[in-house]
């Protein structure tokens, strides 16, 4: 179903543009030698931007120690408090009368030439209350938030501009927003809002409270064959929809699959996804998680949509056996195993499951199961009991329902690992040049109520 996204924004959300003072002093962006999936870029030491008095106040939440927007920029760490003393971080209002603007002036020694860059948002951080930190990655952080007016619960993904510029990931980040803006599918996360300030990008998406598939796989070690069949069916439908739109995900793994409160799969994290993949002769950069990466990507050969079918084959093996089929502490040796070795199976894996996994893990992408479309996979004997239309309409009861106590419940998220990452990776952000800010022109987005209704 084709859905039209209206660019008309609700009048009650209109605010005056923010005025920024941007220095013309050259800024050197230093490339990090660390993995983009393991670290953030080093601290910029040249320039400090003063924050407005209306920046968010530091507070804390009852379950997870959560930094406010100020601590997201400054690196300060919130203190834990008991449930009886719990507070919700309230974002101080940034809304101004239509004839006023807000200045962010660099603190520099001596006179310095500046120019004015305007960032206009119809919605901003003041429209949300931050409650909990629920995710952490190389891109930044994900928070559970509540919309002030509607009281709806969302997930807020925070991305640092200087980080993605340094990592040369601007195109991927903008592609993530564009993909989520155009895609509507029951097993793919929805984007509701996108906005920015002078330092960061913000994506407001569905809050999916069942937790990561990875979290549940860690707890259970392995899933039953029926459970794997159900998850595979939903994910195949999600990938089929993406591929029909010429989109390749490129980072399919348990961490990027969420379970909703009913137990359905939700595919998320499109930070490495590629748009306009129409042939099998595309050139993909070496990106993704190595254990799930297709041989043709490792060999820097031409690639296509079949890279996702390889990844889902690895995922199926992981769910059934409890680990990926090709592992090694040495990354070079792991790459060699992926390129040359065959998957080995324990005796308890059924013949139909083995056949499906082997088909998906065919080294030659032109002969891989799914190379001619998802219909090849859907017709495999492993799925003979699956009623695809009922799966897509969510008419089949999921084999596992996560325990939740409400839409804002965060009990299915890994609290311990998140608490270890409360502090932001650096205390100051650099001043971006006007040409760098121009990368993000047109980033803001509001999904219209009409479009939201069409997704129900």
Swiss-Prot record:
Protein residues bound to ATP: 134-142, 157
Domain (AGC-kinase C-terminal) ranges: 384-455
Keywords: ATP-binding, Kinase, Nucleotide-binding, Phosphoprotein, Serine/threonine-protein kinase, Transferase
Compositionally biased intervals (Low complexity): 50-83
Record region (Disordered): 50-84
GO molecular function, one term: protein serine/threonine kinase activity
PROSITE patterns named among the record's database cross-references: AGC_KINASE_CTER (PS51285), PROTEIN_KINASE_ATP (PS00107), PROTEIN_KINASE_DOM (PS50011), PROTEIN_KINASE_ST (PS00108)
Recorded GO CC terms: cytoplasm
Pfam families: Pkinase
Protein kinase domain residues: 128-383
SUPFAM superfamilies given in the database record: Protein kinase-like (PK-like)
Enzyme Commission code: 2.7.11.1
Protein origin, superkingdom: Eukaryota
Similarity comment: family membership: Belongs to the protein kinase superfamily. AGC Ser/Thr protein kinase family.
Descriptive protein name: Probable serine/threonine-protein kinase DDB_G0277449
Organism: Dictyostelium discoideum (Social amoeba)
